[in-house]
Every structure is written in C-alpha cells, then in structure tokens.
C-alpha cells in the first residue's frame, strides 16, 4: 500500500514540475506573443470554451438539441425537400436573436425573401440586414466581410443550391461545370470556419436535396455543394413535412419532423416534430402544452387536463385557451420548462 502511495506522490511531483517548467512557460509566452492572447489556454480554466446558445424558436427543438438551442460561433446546416419549412425555421432563429438584442443578416441567394412573412413571424425588418448577391463567390465574400466585422450574431444563407459559381453563370448552357460549386464551397468553408469561431457568429446554411444517379442500394438522396459543409457543420438538421394540420376540415398548417443527423455539442439522432401554422410559423403555445404534459407540470387524465389539482378543461384546445388568457402565467411556465431543459443538458 505504501508503494502505491509513493508512486502517486512521485507522479504528482512530476506533474507539478512539468507545469512549472521554464521551457513550457517560455513556449506559451512565445505562442501568445506571435498569435495573440487566448491562442493557447488550459481547457478547464477557459470560459471561452463553454458553448453559448440561443433558442431556435421552438421549445421542442431546443430540447432535442440537448443544449437548449443553437450554439454560437458554429456552422449549422438545415436541409430537406422543397417546401418542408427550412426557411421558416431559420427565420425563427433570427426572431430569437433580435429578442436578445443581437444583429442578424440574411444572404438571399434565391432572391425569394418575403418581408411581410418575416413581419408575421415577429422579425423586426428594420433591423435585419439583407443581401441578394449575383453569384456564389459574391455571396461568400459578403459572408466573410460580415463575419470579420465581429458585429453580427447570426447569418442565414438561403440557399447553398443557389450559390452558383461566376464561371457557370458567365459560360454557355452547354458548358460542363462538374464540381465547380463543391470546390467553391470547400475553399470558402476552410477559410471561414476559424473566423466564425473567433467572431462567435452563428452561420446557418439552408440546403436542398438532390438524387444521385444510378444508386440501387442505400439512400439516393444527397445535399448540394459537396461534402465540405457536412464536415464543417457542428449541427445538421434534416427537415421533412409530416402531416397536415386541420381546423374544421381546412388545412391551416403542417407538422414537420426534424432529425438531428449530426450534433457535435450533444447527443445526435434525436427528433422533434413541430407544428408550422401558415403565416404564423411555429405553434409555440401548442408545443408548450406538449412539454408541460411531458414534464408533468400539467396533468392529463384521459381527455381532461389539470394544473395544480385544478381542472383546466377537456382537450388540448382548452389548455391553449387557458394559456392565452394569462400571459404572465404562460411566461412563468415557459421559464419553468426552459429550466428543466437546462438541467437535462
């Protein structure tokens, strides 16, 4: 037993000598002199390495992401079929950043951003920067300049498929342009990845699905722009339309299923099914009801709902009406749910 204790003491002594080594201190000093303060740090003592987050606009998605929302200073890819809710999901992120007093920018490569729809979702359009670039290189140059300003909290690029290289635009329709976009994206992301982390800017790329030709086995679907975005993304969300939402036999929205295909900040492969209402976006009150029941804050027995042993009413609609009737109570319950999500991280 005494031999083991002696070994531990010897190891502790060696460790202490290593940390107090003159050579190590000189090396750290030289690194900071050449590359700036903070270029090397002790992992356990660095506040900079804690992942800062902001809400996605959906409590259900925040819960599934495992860290309470989107991480700051990271690249995120949202992809899926057309009209599946990708842009709406991204616009809600802008809304949440603005609520925190942050600045957001939207690079509209598709030239399809609707100001009225943005306003309906709660975005202050007078405080949203928008760019409609002529080609892919211009879009990525604007993206780099915005990141280098160190003043932007969130940038949306809509979409990768619309980032067409200048060479392709200026060429003939018959010209072959295989791999041009992939090379452009790869070069840009290698350059931007470090800048994004240093500026603490979150960049969300919206992407589309294409089908590979000649695939017999496995999934023929792939995203545009090559493999670089898949590699550099900290989070990849696959968005697919699920089912229609009906009210008196009229379609008022649709449910979308979000699968977290990649997550470098928490456990991946979790899913969230959220409701998107036409011209309103995410049904926040509806998903709050689901989480209140899930965390047993609101009790459900058959079709009856109750809160603190007092009956609310029958059906989910009665709970939504109960929440809409008292804004203060609703905000308190939202904070209660957020605390539970934070404790689960």
Curated annotation (Swiss-Prot):
Q: Name one Pfam family in it.
A: RecA
Q: Give all cystine bridges in this chain.
A: none
Alphabetized UniProt keyword annotations: ATP-binding, Cytoplasm, DNA damage, DNA recombination, DNA repair, DNA-binding, Nucleotide-binding, SOS response
Q: Say which domain of life the source belongs to.
A: Bacteria
Check the record and name the PROSITE patterns matching this protein.
RECA_1 (PS00321), RECA_2 (PS50162), RECA_3 (PS50163)
Q: Does the keyword Protein biosynthesis apply?
A: no
Subcellular location per UniProt equals: Cytoplasm
Which SMART domains does this entry report, sorted A to Z? Answer: AAA (SM00382)
Summarizing the function annotation, the protein's role is: Can catalyze the hydrolysis of ATP in the presence of single-stranded DNA, the ATP-dependent uptake of single-stranded DNA by duplex DNA, and the ATP-dependent hybridization of homologous single-stranded DNAs. It interacts with LexA causing its activation and leading to its autocatalytic cleavage.
- Predominant location: cytoplasm
Which Gene3D superfamilies does the entry link to?
P-loop containing nucleotide triphosphate hydrolases
Alphabetized GO MF terms: ATP binding; ATP hydrolysis activity; ATP-dependent DNA damage sensor activity; damaged DNA binding; single-stranded DNA binding
CC terms in the record's Gene Ontology section: cytosol
Its protein name is Protein RecA
**Which residues does ATP bind?**
80-87
Protein family (similarity comment): Belongs to the RecA family.
Q: Name one GO biological process term.
A: DNA repair
Q: Does the keyword Zinc apply?
A: no
Membrane-spanning intervals of the chain: none
